[in-house]
Amino acid sequence: MDKEQAIKIARAYKQAILPLYGDAKVYLYGSYSKGTAHQDSDIDVAVVVPHIEGNWFSVVPPLWTKARSVSTLIEPVLMEAGEHSPLYDDVMRTGVIV
C-alpha cells in the first residue's frame, strides 16, 4: 500500500466517525505520513477534537469499532486539540490532515 491508499482509507474512516465526532480533525500520521511505511505497517490515525467529553473508557471504544468496520489496519488515537504531549506535537508536525 502507498501513502495515497492510506489517505483514502483514513478519509473513509473520517466519514465513518462523523456521527460520533463531527467536529473532529482527522490526521494520518506515523510511517505513512513520513514515507517510511513497509508491508506490515498499520495506518496511524489521530482524531483531534476540541474537548474530550465523558469517560475515556466510554468514548474511545467506538472509535476502534468504527476503525475495524473500515480497515483492520487502522490504529486510531483520540486527542484533545492543543494537548501537551510528544505524540500530539508529532501529529501536528508530520501528520497529513484528511
Task: Give residue spans per PLM region.
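Catalytic core of pol beta-like nucleotidyltransferases
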Residues: 1-25, 34-39, 50-98
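Short, well-ordered beta-strand segments
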Residues: 27, 44-46
